[in-house]
């Protein structure tokens, strides 16, 4: 039987067949406690929000994880590979309002749809471990974690300034404030103090920073981002007393406290900048309408660091002045500045234009003094004049009294000593990291298990009363949190004194839900949040996979939660993820015509032109970019599965480019992947029909065996290195070698072909598992499933390099090549080179002047005459 006439792979029939076989055998289940007879390996992809439809970015993410899981299983590991749903969140509430459907029903319907798609893709998931964060079985255990953290001093309640949407009656994150208005309601946002619950992540700031060094299987980029977010800064906290404060400025308002990393430049003080939310700014605004207007302008800018950084730097002179603690005779003005953040440091900065470009630009814009206190190397103190750029890098202090002549490091030490002696400051470590505010005025979230009693204060709900279950009989016909308007759920008796009390109606930030799910997967049906033997046996996650967009918040919160769970006795590990891989996005061209954006299936290529299918009219082709519903450049995984099969989708997302890079989704690429799968199936079927299973090896098959075993080694190395695209390339090469061997006759080639076909079944299994099972069933009927077989081992004798190709030059020009054993003696190489027919012809009659031999690389003959 030839390659072209062998039966095709009927994916519509065979993919469901093999999925049912795996399910029937419970192939991917593992016990809660890892087995003692083999090493464990925990593979986890960031679980999805159940929006209703998987997109091809999901397909890439989960395929990468599945390749790792299947490969490690074949390598003899006990592999846990679970799946769940990050199921709370605002989109469900929006759907409830827009579609008149309960968030719970909307969410669970979406989960059912997406689960079905994942199962059609053939992922090796242990579905018995499935969790959904919106179910009481999950969030009730989360409430227990919260009360335990409260008891351990890791939770506190305090007033916090928030972005309040007066129409939606809810708190908005900084990113949800656009031009001073709520992103959904459009209402002008108010700054409001609310009592909020905080998790004290700052308690772990130092270990969270230090232990980044241990995460050597994390991308350097992610570790750097976390390091900057945690933001450890050594410096000084300096108190600047108000110079001649006006009446009414009591002792809480008679000074400005500033954190600075450059106390050595205090003699360069030009101005003090305070946040629009600083108490001093609010005090000034009470009697100054212009100040109040400027503060309102700052509020409209929002509080997003990115927006503030990009905005024009503006300020308002309060008329107040402060004294320099190192030289009280010198004073400087206090400005409200739109670039000062209240939640970093003290909400105030001291401006030293000489050493900071932003301060220099601000000072020159408002014609403020620019004291020169930093002298660059090679400059003369008598003649140096600061130009348009602030001084950076090495410098010496001058015009700075007792600091003159010192370098900045030595000057910092002396300044801090002087400030502490004066009672005007002290050396401190400041953190950019802030405690995590977890209160959200939302219904569709985990209820915070607190009861507020006028007598007892906030009381944690006792363990025996957990979970606090969300009521289902709520309505969304008015603004605000439906829990506030549900009297039978809200009003309860105090667990301590029995008096009337009310439940906390805020729910957890949904980042809480995703901060410990990896631990719950280890014992998802337990009555406690974790089972120590299970959690400590499986954790940390060996390979975590997800997008770079989660590099900071989710990953940092998960690291914090792991430490908090350790401190409260739920875990014995400190880091949740030993290995992290951040995959790139899937992109697609965009298409549009006069009617607007078009879906990819609405266009087709005709020669060099792209036209609309139904009209044949040309369309405009945009660049390949992130898929988005607005530009309709999306592709449905379901459509791909139905047209080409799951294995085609899996193969394509692995083969195009390194997984950390963005990849372009193309119809041509998918079609090529489908053709390869069919070619491979026909090839293996042809070998099965042609070559007897008991064929003996012989010399005729040596070349193919060499390719086969080198492919085994190369694919294993590629999967260990997380470069599946390289594995795909090597499998293409082995497939081509096997196809070429179909034309060879002789003793030994049949056995080599069967070996190559069998190896192709085993090596393609992590990527195209259905096809691999089907090919093996054709090649070895009635034998074990591929998923139950070990990974093949490469035989060393076939890995050794048999020969090297050496170029032969005459006067530097390549005239031929020879094959010789590696590291062959020079005399042997030169003799072979002179015997090469073309070289021998060209050397005839010439005088050899010099013979140059570079071992294993090249021979060059220098001739004359």
From Swiss-Prot:
> Molecular function (GO) terms listed?
aminoacyl-tRNA deacylase activity; ATP binding; leucine-tRNA ligase activity
EC top class, as a word: ligase
Spell out the subcellular localization from the entry.
Cytoplasm
Q: Which residues form the signal peptide?
A: none
| UniProt: ATP binding residues | 629
Annotated GO biological process: leucyl-tRNA aminoacylation
Q: What Enzyme Commission number(s) apply to this enzyme?
A: 6.1.1.4
Motif extent ('KMSKS' region): 626-630
Main localization is cytoplasm
Any S-S bridges, and between which cysteines?
none
Q: Which UniProt keywords apply?
A: Aminoacyl-tRNA synthetase, ATP-binding, Cytoplasm, Ligase, Nucleotide-binding, Protein biosynthesis
**Catalytic reactions on record:** tRNA(Leu) + L-leucine + ATP = L-leucyl-tRNA(Leu) + AMP + diphosphate
Q: Where is this motif: 'HIGH' region?
A: 48-58
Q: Which GO terms describe its cellular component?
A: cytosol
Q: Which family does the UniProt entry place this protein in? A: Belongs to the class-I aminoacyl-tRNA synthetase family.
Q: Which NCBIfam families match?
A: leuS_bact
Please identify the protein, giving its name as recorded. Leucine--tRNA ligase
């Amino acid at each position: 039987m030839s390659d072209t006439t062998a039966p095709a792979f009927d994916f519509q029939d065979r993919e469901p067949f093999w999925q049912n076989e795996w399910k029937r055998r419970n192939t991917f289940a593992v016990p809660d406690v890892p087995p003692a007879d083999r090493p464990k390996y925990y593979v986890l992809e960031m679980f999805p929000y159940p929006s209703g439809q998987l997109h091809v970015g999901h397909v890439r993410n989960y395929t990468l994880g599945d390749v790792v899981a299947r490969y490690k299983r074949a390598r003899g590991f006990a592999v846990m590979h679970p799946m769940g749903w990050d199921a709370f969140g605002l989109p469900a509430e929006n759907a409830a309002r827009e579609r008149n459907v309960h968030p719970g029903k909307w969410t669970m319907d979406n989960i059912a749809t997406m689960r079905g798609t994942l199962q059609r893709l053939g992922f090796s998931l242990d579905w018995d471990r499935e969790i959904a964060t919106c179910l009481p079985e999950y969030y009730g255990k989360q409430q227990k974690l919260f009360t335990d953290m409260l008891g351990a001093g890791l939770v506190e309640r305090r007033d916090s300034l928030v972005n309040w949407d007066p129409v939606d009656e809810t708190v908005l994150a900084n990113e949800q404030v656009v031009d001073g208005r709520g992103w959904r309601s459009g209402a002008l946002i108010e700054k409001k103090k609310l009592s909020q619950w905080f998790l004290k992540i700052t308690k772990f700031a130092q270990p969270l920073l230090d232990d980044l060094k241990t995460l050597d299987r994390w991308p350097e980029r992610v570790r750097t981002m976390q390091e900057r977010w945690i933001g450890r800064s050594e410096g000084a906290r300096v108190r600047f007393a108000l110079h001649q404060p006006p009446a009414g400025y009591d002792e809480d308002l008679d000074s400005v406290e500033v954190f600075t990393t450059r106390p050595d430049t205090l003699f360069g003080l030009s101005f003090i900048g305070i946040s629009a939310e600083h108490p001093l700014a609010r005090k000034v605004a009470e009697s100054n309408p212009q100040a109040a207007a400027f503060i309102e302008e700052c509020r409209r800018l929002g509080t997003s660091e990115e927006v503030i950084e990009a905005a024009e730097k503006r300020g308002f002179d309060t008329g107040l002045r402060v004294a320099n603690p190192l030289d009280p005779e010198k004073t400087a003005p206090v400005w409200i500045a739109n670039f000062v953040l209240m939640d970093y440091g003290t909400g105030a900065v001291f401006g030293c234009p000489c050493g900071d470009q932003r301060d220099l630009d601000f000072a020159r814009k408002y014609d403020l003094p620019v004291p020169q206190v930093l002298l660059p190397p090679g400059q003369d103190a008598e003649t140096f004049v600061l130009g348009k750029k602030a001084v950076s890098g090495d410098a010496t202090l001058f015009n700075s009294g007792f600091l003159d002549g010192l370098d900045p490091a030595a000057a910092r030490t002396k300044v801090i000593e002087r400030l502490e002696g004066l009672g005007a400051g002290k050396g401190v470590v400041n953190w950019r990291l802030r405690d995590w505010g977890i209160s959200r005025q939302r219904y569709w979230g985990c209820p915070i298990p607190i009861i507020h009693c006028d007598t007892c204060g906030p009381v944690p709900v006792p363990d025996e009363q957990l979970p606090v279950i969300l009521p289902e009989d709520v309505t969304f016909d008015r603004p605000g949190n439906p829990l506030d308007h549900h009297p039978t759920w809200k009003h309860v008796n105090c667990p301590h004194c029995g008096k009337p009390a009310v439940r906390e109606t805020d729910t957890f930030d949904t980042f809480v839900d995703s901060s410990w799910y990896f631990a719950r997967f280890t014992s998802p049906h337990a009555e406690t949040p974790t089972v120590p033997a299970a959690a400590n046996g499986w954790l940390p996650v060996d390979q975590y996979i997800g997008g770079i967009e989660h590099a900071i918040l989710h990953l940092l919160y998960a690291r914090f939660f792991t430490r908090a769970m350790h401190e409260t006795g739920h875990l014995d590990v400190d880091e949740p993820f030993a290995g992290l891989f951040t995959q790139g996005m899937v992109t697609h061209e965009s298409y549009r015509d006069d009617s607007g954006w078009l879906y990819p299936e609405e266009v087709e290529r005709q020669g060099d032109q792209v036209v609309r299918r139904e009209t044949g009219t040309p369309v405009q082709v945009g660049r390949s970019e992130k898929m988005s519903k607005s530009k309709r450049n999306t592709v449905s995984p379901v459509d791909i599965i139905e047209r080409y099969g799951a294995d085609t989708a899996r193969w394509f997302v692995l083969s195009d480019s390194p997984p950390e890079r963005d990849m372009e989704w193309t119809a041509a690429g998918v079609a090529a992947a489908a053709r390869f799968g069919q070619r491979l199936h026909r090839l293996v079927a042809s070998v099965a029909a042609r070559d007897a299973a008991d064929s003996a090896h012989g010399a005729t098959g040596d070349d193919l065996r060499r390719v086969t075993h080198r492919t085994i080694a190369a694919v294993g190395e590629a999967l260990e290195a997380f470069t599946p695209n390289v594995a795909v390339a090597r499998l293409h090469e082995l497939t081509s070698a096997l196809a070429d061997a179909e034309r060879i006759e002789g003793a030994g080639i049949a056995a080599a072909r069967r070996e190559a076909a069998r190896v192709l079944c085993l090596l393609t299994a992590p990527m195209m598992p259905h096809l691999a099972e089907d090919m093996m069933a054709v090649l070895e009927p009635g034998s074990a499933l591929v998923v139950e077989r070990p990974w093949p081992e490469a035989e060393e004798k076939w890995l050794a390099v048999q020969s090297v190709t050496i170029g032969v030059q005459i006067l530097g020009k390549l005239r031929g090549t020879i094959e010789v054993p590696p590291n062959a003696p020079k005399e042997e190489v030169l003799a072979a080179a002179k015997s090469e027919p073309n070289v021998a012809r060209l050397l005839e009659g010439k005088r050899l002047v010099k013979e140059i031999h570079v071992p294993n690389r090249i021979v060059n003959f220098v001739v004359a005459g």
